[in-house]
């Protein structure tokens, strides 16, 4: 038992020593985190995520969280007798569904995340893109193999982001938690894919990192091998051959766009892994897949 404790202590010391250069490097920088998947539904992972976010803030990194809420939305739609439908990974959202989406994201999910972070000593503040109209949206039309310009209801894409609200929260020492609901020119609400919001927000904030938490280890090839580094060219090939499809498409598109437009590192990581954020940011090996803005695959 004593030997095990010594080994454990040695491992902890090694981990701290490995983390120190990264703490120095990233202190003062912004990290936008797309929070979703199992990490949002399993109690132990939810608590671990909250602790990790608080730790990031304590060592000088400024986390900004953009959350999804697909399972929670589906559960509420089922309760009212509506079936969730998707086109190219995007949720079909009529007026009734939009009311439910906004209620679940802004009312339940956002407040739960804020409360969890604050329980562990953080100062999280929840906001929606409709607050101060800081996320302006326009209707998103989807091209499918059968038809171009498919209207899927009150689903939007980001037209512009005014980062003043989020930057103000960061300057006050707060952790912004953003619900991905935008506002149209007539004041109407738009459901925006959280990956799209996270990517665009990372660009506008000149973030050091964009980290997208998901339920898979990262981007895989057809044989199931993890691809640790990818370029836009390689990703185009994976989409063309059908390796990437469905819900991965908006995630990948956002990661690529952010990388191309100046976010220094974009990552797709496995949110099912305890301490996934810390493993990516503070260890030499990292986890998941890194999207590069250009150049050759490594």
UniProtKB/Swiss-Prot annotation:
Keywords: Amino-acid biosynthesis, Arginine biosynthesis, ATP-binding, Cytoplasm, Kinase, Nucleotide-binding, Transferase. Substrate binds at residues 69-70, 91, 191. GO terms for molecular function: acetylglutamate kinase activity; ATP binding. It catalyses: N-acetyl-L-glutamate + ATP = N-acetyl-L-glutamyl 5-phosphate + ADP. CDD domains: AAK_NAGK-C (cd04250). One of its GO terms (cellular component) is cytoplasm. Belongs to the acetylglutamate kinase family. ArgB subfamily. This is Acetylglutamate kinase. The gene is argB.
């Amino acid at each position: 038992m004593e030997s095990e404790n010594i080994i454990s202590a040695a491992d902890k010391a090694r981990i701290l020593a490995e983390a120190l250069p990264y703490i120095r490097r990233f202190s003062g920088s912004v990290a936008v985190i797309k929070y979703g998947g199992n990490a949002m539904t399993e109690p132990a992972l939810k608590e671990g995520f909250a602790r990790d976010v608080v730790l990031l803030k304590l060592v000088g990194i400024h986390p900004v969280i953009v959350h999804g809420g697909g399972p929670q939305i589906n559960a509420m739609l089922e309760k009212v007798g509506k079936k969730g439908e998707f086109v190219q990974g995007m949720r079909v959202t009529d007026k009734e569904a939009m009311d439910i989406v906004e209620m679940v994201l802004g009312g339940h999910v956002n407040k739960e995340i804020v409360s969890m972070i604050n329980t562990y000593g953080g100062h999280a503040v929840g906001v929606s893109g409709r607050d101060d109209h800081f996320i302006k949206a326009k209707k998103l039309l989807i091209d499918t193999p059968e038809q171009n310009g498919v209207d899927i209801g009150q689903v939007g894409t980001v037209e512009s982001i005014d980062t003043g609200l989020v930057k103000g929260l960061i300057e006050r020492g707060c952790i912004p938690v953003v619900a991905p609901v935008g506002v149209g020119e007539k004041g109407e609400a738009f459901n925006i894919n959280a990956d799209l919001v996270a990517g665009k927000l990372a660009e506008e904030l000149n973030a050091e990192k964009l980290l997208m938490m998901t339920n898979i280890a990262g981007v895989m090839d057809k044989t199931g091998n993890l691809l640790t580094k990818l370029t836009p060219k390689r990703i185009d090939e994976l989409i063309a051959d059908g390796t990437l499809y469905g819900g991965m498409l908006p995630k990948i598109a956002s990661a690529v766009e952010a990388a191309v437009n100046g976010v220094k590192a974009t990552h797709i990581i496995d949110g099912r892994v305890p301490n996934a954020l810390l493993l990516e940011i503070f260890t030499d090996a990292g986890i998941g897949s890194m999207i590069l803005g250009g150049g050759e695959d490594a």
